[in-house]
């Protein structure tokens, strides 16, 4: 598809008509309020695909009771500007009735990787994620779909779903984009003041402390966690949900093994805002992490 202004489409029929021609299609699923992290996904798709489809849909089925669905930031004009600058061809912006019409009754539940950590803290969250992602994959039928590594467990859930259900798509993980402070970019950062965002970078510092302990030879998971917990204890406003060292199947173990998918994940509430982050632990994956984009 020749590069022109990004087209905004709201119906499934419009999307399928626009994608009727030949060429590799890349999908970037988002909930909107785009930032540089999303732009990195779009640029990666642009470099690898002939047509890039960005979806913007605040999916109600992945929000729990008393979560922030009603106040989740929305700004389609801002999203369109980011999409065009990064190189998206199509912006698919369906409403809830398009994605979940009257009588809709199907939910996708991915076992195993979806159950601990975020799955335990936010019951039903990954069912909503898996359901909407599978719908988007069926609507767009891309060769590749791009997800940020910041949502590491979500990436694992999507990969497992695609594998188990034989969906013909390659799932591409894109490294986390961070502020110079180390804070992982997130649409929910908009809830925080600049001072609060600076203090929220303690999550990144805690993860780095765990990495450093592992690099020094520590293999006991409890002691690795303690290195991170000691950093988090410096912030009086933090309400920690979890700090976990997990393998590729999201399982916590007593000792770190030589698994390239070993990851350190953290979730906490700071100033009333729930934030998540993660970094790789193994040397090979850590070298990849050192090449993460930064929002400078």
From Swiss-Prot:
ATP binds at residues 31-38, 148-151, 177, 185-188. Keywords: ATP-binding, Cytoplasm, Ligase, Nucleotide-binding, Pantothenate biosynthesis. It catalyses: (R)-pantoate + beta-alanine + ATP = (R)-pantothenate + AMP + diphosphate + H(+). GO terms for molecular function: ATP binding; pantoate-beta-alanine ligase activity. The active site is at residue 38. It is an enzyme of class 6 (ligase). GO terms for biological process: pantothenate biosynthetic process. It comes from the Bacteria. Its EC number is 6.3.2.1. (R)-pantoate binds at residues 62, 154. Beta-alanine binds at residue 62. Pathway: Cofactor biosynthesis; (R)-pantothenate biosynthesis; (R)-pantothenate from (R)-pantoate and beta-alanine: step 1/1. PANTHER family: CYTIDYLATE KINASE/PANTOATE-BETA-ALANINE LIGASE (PTHR21299), PANTOATE--BETA-ALANINE LIGASE (PTHR21299:SF1). Catalyzes the condensation of pantoate with beta-alanine in an ATP-dependent reaction via a pantoyl-adenylate intermediate. This is Pantothenate synthetase. It comes from Deinococcus geothermalis (strain DSM 11300 / CIP 105573 / AG-3a). The gene is panC.
């Amino acid at each position: 598809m020749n590069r022109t202004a990004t087209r905004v489409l709201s119906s499934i029929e419009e999307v399928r008509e626009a994608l009727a021609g030949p060429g590799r299609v890349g999908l970037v699923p988002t909930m909107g309020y785009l930032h540089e992290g999303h732009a990195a996904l779009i640029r990666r798709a642009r470099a690898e695909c002939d047509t890039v489809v960005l979806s913007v849909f605040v999916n109600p089925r992945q929000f729990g009771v008393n979560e922030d669905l009603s106040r989740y930031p929305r700004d389609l004009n801002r999203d369109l500007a980011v999409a065009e600058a990064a190189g998206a061809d199509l912006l698919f912006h369906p409403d809830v009735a398009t994605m979940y019409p009257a009588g809709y009754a199907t939910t996708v539940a991915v076992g195993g990787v979806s159950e601990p950590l975020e799955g335990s803290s936010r019951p039903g969250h990954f069912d909503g994620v898996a359901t909407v992602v599978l719908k988007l994959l069926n609507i767009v039928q891309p060769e590749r779909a791009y997800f940020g590594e910041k949502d590491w467990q979500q990436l694992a859930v999507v990969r497992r779903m695609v594998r188990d259900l034989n969906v013909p798509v390659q799932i591409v993980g894109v490294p986390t984009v961070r502020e110079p402070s180390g804070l992982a970019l997130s649409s929910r950062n908009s809830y925080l003041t600049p001072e609060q965002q600076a203090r929220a970078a303690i999550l990144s510092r805690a993860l780095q402390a765990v990495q450093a302990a592992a690099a020094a030879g520590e293999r006991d998971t409890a002691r690795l966690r303690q290195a991170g917990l000691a950093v988090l204890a410096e912030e009086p406003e933090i309400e920690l949900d979890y700090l976990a060292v997990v393998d590729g199947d999201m399982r916590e173990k007593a000792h770190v093994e030589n698994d390239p998918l070993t990851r350190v994940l953290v979730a906490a509430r700071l100033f009333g805002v729930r934030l998540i982050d993660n970094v790789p632990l193994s040397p090979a994956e850590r070298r990849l992490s050192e090449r993460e984009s930064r929002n400078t």
